[in-house]
Amino acid sequence: MENLLAFFEGVGVENSNQPWQLDAAMAHQHLELLGKDETSSFLGAYKPNGSRKDLKPWTGPFSELETAQRKNQEGSGLYLCINNGTGLKDADIQQCVALWSEDDKRSKDEQLERWLARMPVPTFIVETGKSLHIYLVLIQPIAPALWKPIQSRLIDFVDGDPAVKSLSRVLRLAGSWYANKDNELTRLVTMRNVTGKRYDLEEIVSCLPEVEPKPQPVPSLKFPPKGGTYPSGTIRNIVDALRCIPPRVPGTGT
């Protein structure tokens, strides 16, 4: 484990851009590692919690990266919708290309060590500051109905943020700048641990605990509708059960 962690320390993507300029090459690599194209990829620019009220959210296709950069420079964070579709709502998602986790309850070293003890080596990681977004990219995209329960099981298993279970989840775009609540750009969102390895769905599922079956509710007997009767077998069972009750003995308080 220590050797693997040490190896990952040197695996990353360098940024050579000027301060506050979006690293377009890194943003495109984020897209390429997911196996996505610009036509099915959507971005969102959102202000940090507690920041300027006049900073309006923006959404658009990845092809409008220059517009997204301006929004970033104004103090909004930039996000990428990970799965493929026609927009940024769950109903818009048509194909799921990866599974992922985020965990900001632990240090970055603890996040990675915990992941590697449970799950395969990541395809890549996006480092946002205090948090790691860990990705497992699928060899073949899968349908949303198949993806949802597996993503939920993954998050539960690694104790990740339950908010990242949604189909249309957006995560920070690599190459963009992190904006604080004062709308100040403080650090570049970078990429690390880039292996490019992709996985069969079965390989990922094999790492997850089996789903425990839900207990089945015991049906309760209901009185028959007015004028109705119980089936004869049911009445016979009740009579047999009543015969097992000891008779009342007078004077014993029973």
Could you say what each language-model-derived stretch is?
Residues E2-A6, E14, G50-R52, C96-A98, ...:
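Modules that initiate DNA replication and primer synthesis
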Residues N84-G87, A117-V121:
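Alpha-helical scaffolding within the catalytic cores
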Residues A163-P215:
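Basic/polar, cationic surfaces and motifs that engage anionic cell-wall
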Residues S51-E64, Q94, W115, N183-G196, ...:
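Short, polar loop/linker segments at the starts of domains and inter-domain junctions
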Residues G44-A45, N83, D103-D104, E127-K130:
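Short loop/turn segments at strand-loop or loop-helix junctions that form parts
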Residues M1-V97:
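DNA replication initiation on ssDNA origins
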Residues H30-L34, L65-Q73, W115-M119, Q151-D161:
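Hydrophobic, Leu/Ile/Phe/Ala-enriched alpha-helical segments that form helix-helix packing faces
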Residues T123-K130, D161-S166:
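Short beta-strand
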